[in-house]
């Protein structure tokens, strides 16, 4: 995630994170929604916090760069 956030060749707004959102099922946020990437949580500008263990997929544009096995 830090690679996409800080490297000048990447546009962080193209990052999409899919995660388990209880009780809804799955939800997705973009890089523009992310305020801070912490040790155990991703903090959003909305005030929500996504635990890292609930992340199931990370995409950059249309490419899946990480998927939970």
Swiss-Prot record:
Database matches in InterPro entries: MJ1316 (IPR040459), UPF0248 (IPR007547)
Superkingdom as given in the UniProt entry: Archaea
Family, as annotated: Belongs to the UPF0248 family.
Protein name (database record): UPF0248 protein AF_0420
Organism: Archaeoglobus fulgidus (strain ATCC 49558 / DSM 4304 / JCM 9628 / NBRC 100126 / VC-16)
